Amino acid sequence: LGVAGCCALMLCGFGIKDSITDIPARQFTHVTTEDATLYFNNVTKEEAKEVLNNETSFQSYAILNNTNATIGKYDIYISVLSENFEEFQHFYDLDTKEKCDLNDDEVLISDKLASLLKVKKGDTIEFYDDNNNYNMKVGAVVENYIQHFIFMNERTYNKNSSKDLTYNTAYVELGDLTKDEQLDLQAKMLENSNVLNMTFIQDSIDQANDMLQTLDKVVVI
């Protein structure tokens, strides 16, 4: 390769490492900002609120539904967001970097999925889940670094779906809890038959950072 080629590869390696290692912080402190996530067994809004309102450790929350769906040859998630989601889920236009609204009769689409589908703001996209086919206008292409997502609000779902909306996820804000207190809270939540699991966002950040540290060895080599 020669000296110039080797130097170019070294610079490329450092650049890749720096760009990838920013992803956990960008996703979990900029795009989504919950402290923990509860996973429900497809409950009504009233059932979800009963669980959440009865726990004093939860300072605030937002309820949503994440559903597997297909668009073209790609597997995606449809995320239907209920009230108060703006506290935890933040949408930034890929081009302008400005915050986006999740308007009625529109969807927001994550940037990697938009690139794969070659769609942009203002286009109409068709996708389907187990119960419905959707033809929706793209309100904006937004930043997202994990999985492929299409986001819509509750009113848009109810207008376009033949099935009543249930909820399988909640983002929650916690007070200052120690690790032991978090584990106790998790065990308490899992005693409820409507709760399938509870995870903490800091654990996800730590796991992602641990995996990314392996890049240091690659860069050194």
What are these regions (language model features)?
Residues 1-7:
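N-terminal Sec/SRP start-transfer signal
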Residues 7-33:
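Alpha-helical transmembrane segments
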Residues 20, 78, 109, 122, ...:
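Hydrophobic, well-ordered secondary-structure elements that form the walls
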Residues 20-24, 186-221:
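Peri-transmembrane interface segments
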Residues 26-30, 34, 45-46, 50, ...:
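Short beta-strand boundary microenvironments
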Residues 31-32, 101, 141-183, 202:
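Small-residue transmembrane helix packing/gating motifs
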Residues 44-50, 177-187:
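Short, conserved charged micro-motifs
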Residues 125-134, 140-143, 154-155, 173-176, ...:
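C-terminal structured "cap/appendage" subdomains that terminate the fold
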